């Protein structure tokens, strides 16, 4: 895959987010076709990971997208395959270390600067995607970062 093709996938992830999809959906859908996964099904599978998993502000949805894509790329399919499982875990840990280095945290609440359990877990209602939302949230940049990290992984394979 060329650099240009990978750049287009990174941009597709950002475009997905700007169209209203969650962080995880945006990242996974940008690469899902590489694994024979229909984009609609990819968005459904990734839907609950938005807002730091169900808007609980836990692991960043964009980061969860990296994890899901690594599973599609190199996840083991036999329960007894410890070597395959370990290889997948190594890739996840390496890519998430890069994400943490770039973004300061893997945790949605920390990335958003939300302090306190009650404030971070106050509602299951998705935020309205207004101009103010996009202006004040770092999420599009985090989606871009996650997609770029995964694209670079694919390039280096």
Label the predicted regions.
Residues 1-18:
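Polybasic, low-complexity association/targeting segments
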Residues 2-4, 30-48, 118-123:
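Acidic-glycine-rich active-site phosphate/pyrophosphate-binding loop
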Residues 15-19, 26-37:
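Long, hydrophobic N-terminal alpha-helical segment
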Residues 23, 60, 108:
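Short cysteine clusters
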Residues 49-56:
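Transmembrane alpha-helix interface/packing and boundary motifs in multi-pass membrane proteins
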Residues 59-65:
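Membrane-inserting effector segments that mediate pore formation, membrane fusion
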Residues 65-75:
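DPxDG-like acidic metal-binding loop motif
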């Amino acid at each position: 895959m060329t650099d240009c093709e990978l750049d287009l996938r990174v941009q597709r992830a950002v475009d997905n987010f700007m169209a209203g999809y969650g962080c995880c959906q945006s990242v996974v859908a940008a690469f899902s076709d590489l694994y024979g996964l229909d984009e609609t099904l990819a968005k459904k599978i990734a839907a609950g990971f938005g807002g730091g998993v169900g808007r609980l502000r836990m692991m960043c949805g964009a980061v969860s997208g990296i994890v899901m894509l690594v599973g599609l790329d190199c996840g083991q399919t036999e329960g007894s395959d410890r070597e395959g499982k370990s290889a997948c875990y190594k890739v996840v840990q390496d890519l998430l270390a890069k994400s943490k280095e770039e973004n300061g945290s893997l945790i949605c609440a920390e990335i958003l600067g939300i302090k306190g359990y009650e404030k971070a877990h106050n509602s299951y209602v998705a935020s309205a995607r207004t101009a103010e939302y996009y202006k004040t949230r770092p999420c599009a940049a985090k989606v871009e970062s996650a997609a770029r990290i995964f694209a670079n992984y694919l390039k280096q394979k």
